[in-house]
Amino acid sequence: MDAEHFPVGFFRWDQRPAPVVAAAAAPTTTVFNKDHGRPLEVILPMNGRKDLKSLEDLFKEYGVRYVTLAKMTEMGFTANTLVNMTEEEIEDLMKTLVELYHMDLLIGERYGIKSAIRAEKKRLQDSLEMQRLEILSEAERKRILHDDQNTFAAAMASEGTSKELRANDPLIFPESTSADHAPMNIASCKDSTLILQNSNQAQFCGSGLIGVPEHSSESDERKADTNKQKRRRSKEPGEDGEDRPREHPFIVTEPGELARGKKNGLDYLFDLYEQCGKFLLEVQRIAKEKGEKCPTKVTNQVFRHAKHNGAVYINKPKMRHYVHCYALHCLDSEQSNHLRRLYKERGENVGAWRQACYYPLVAIARENNWDIEGIFNRNEKLKIWYVPTKLRQLCHMERSKECQ
């Protein structure tokens, strides 16, 4: 090919000094001359060198020659342009280089261009995902801290209120009666109900009794209609013809505690994972008898086998949703039990407890050189489960912070 079509900066072996007039018009850079031991001024294009440097970074270690990079820069392509192009557009670019500019693209260069662009896209997507997870984790920490502060403030307020009531209201606490505190006139409050039915509508009367506004029959009927509409809406099928997704029927319970009502406890949840391990053994036995490939982890085949055997309460979304909670239960039962007791005392729902189970696992991964995959594979009960994607991403994010 004719070398006159390329910027002079690519031909670093060219030892000819640049003209003085051209050097005054264009920015220069210094290249060391090995033969004469003195610096040599080489002219660089005004707007091509910056783009070229970006292309060098993009295609570094992917086997793309400088001649190809120079021609792509001359055509006006930058690293950002290439990263935002589709596979078809990349094919058109390489076809143009071959047919229109008569360049001999090597096979490795073709795959190198595609691989470099694909890797850069994946890196950008991973970076955005890490930022999103970092924002979510920070928001979760702030929410937990805010809940702790609210709980402490509510406890202090309730303690102060109870002391004030005990001192000032002999009608409620007869043991504190004295001559200075005569029984109050109940009629002074608009409503003398002492039972709190709605904390948002509760008001304190002058002497400490809690007055709750009286609910009219119209408001009761309106609330009843609203509840009926909610129940009717929950029973209606979704837009796609399937049932609407419902919350998993679990509540936070302490170890050994039996759940009451319609929802199950966490011991029942962990027992489901034990049952999945037994169903996996049955699937492996059947596969060996048929001479088929045996699954080593809990896959869709295991869930179908469980459903076929009547275990309809075992399904893939539920088991994948809480697998990291089961991992913490297997790896550090003391920490798992502590979290269960803590969130049970706070009255938190199972969703908040589930989010809190991530952080002890990240700490365990830090102690094991961030080998979360190996931690799962070395445990007899966890090696049949896949590592959750979010747990893997959190470990990667924390590891990146330590490296920085």
Swiss-Prot record:
Disordered: annotated segments: 210-251
Alphabetical UniProt keywords: Activator, Developmental protein, DNA-binding, Nucleus, Transcription, Transcription regulation
Family recorded in the similarity comment: Belongs to the FLO/LFY family.
Record-linked Pfam families: C_LFY_FLO, SAM_LFY
Protein name stated in the entry: Floricaula/leafy-like protein FL1
Free-text function comment from the UniProt entry: Probable transcription factor.
Residues of the DNA-binding region: 246-250, 315-322, 386-389
Secretion signal, residue range per the UniProt entry: none
